[in-house]
Design a protein with these regions (language model features):
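A cross-family glycoside hydrolase active-site/sugar-binding cleft signature
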Residues: 155, 188-189
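P-loop NTPase catalytic phosphate-binding loop
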Residues: 2-107, 112-178
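Conserved AAA+ ATPase "SRH/arginine-finger" region at the nucleotide-binding site
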Residues: 179-188
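Short, intrinsically disordered, charge-balanced linker/junction segments flanking boundaries
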Residues: 1, 189-190
Length: 190
């Protein structure tokens, strides 16, 4: 249930993302600081998990990962606003079908056994290139991300980050205590 991200910390040990303990990742950094490399690393790690346990929806408006993702793992890929809006609409339908009904028992909630299928990893490289409203349909299911098997991985430039943290989509992710990675950034960016 974890993906190796790299080496770090005071002892230069392995840094892993346990996606069951910390549902989402937010990575902030300056241009050319390694944000897209992090995305590539996460995609490679999730590919090792297999399509039975993980499916990827990749929003990549710079097309940095085009052709680099195993098609078997890919549930959707978008490089434009229109494609992103369509993918998000389909995701919302899938995730709403996974929401627990009133008949779900506490044990089923704990085991997440009222639905079957892989977890969905929404991977957004360069969130600053995507209009926040493109993700508005997901706002109703984001609070239930753990229950419905949704994980969000976001990279964003550091410039304007403080303001962006108050936009609805990123604010909801922030409220769920994501795994935070801060790469090289100008201190004036906040």
């Amino acid at each position: 249930n974890s993906v190796l991200l790299g080496v770090g910390g005071p002892k230069l040990g392995a840094v892993n993302w346990d996606y069951l303990a910390s549902q989402h990742i937010v990575c902030i950094g300056a241009q050319e600081s390694g944000k897209s490399t992090l995305i590539s690393t996460i995609i490679a790690g999730l590919t090792q998990i297999g399509r039975e346990r993980a499916r990827l929806v990749v929003i990549d408006h710079r097309r940095s990962h085009l052709g680099a993702i195993d098609p078997d793992m890919l549930a959707g890929y978008s490089a434009s606003t229109q494609e992103t809006e369509k993918l998000v609409a389909v995701m919302k339908i899938t995730l709403e079908e996974r929401l627990p009904s009133a008949e779900v028992t506490p044990q089923q909630l704990k085991d997440r056994s009222w639905w079957t299928g892989p977890d969905i990893f929404l991977i957004v490289d360069n969130l600053d290139l995507v209009a926040d409203m493109a993700f508005a349909p997901l706002l109703s299911v984001l609070p239930h991300a753990r229950d419905v098997g949704l994980h969000v991985v976001i990279t964003r430039k550091s410039g304007g980050c403080v303001r962006a943290l108050f936009q609805p989509f990123l604010a909801e992710i922030k409220d769920q205590s994501p795994f935070i990675i801060v790469l090289d950034a100008d201190k004036d960016d906040g």
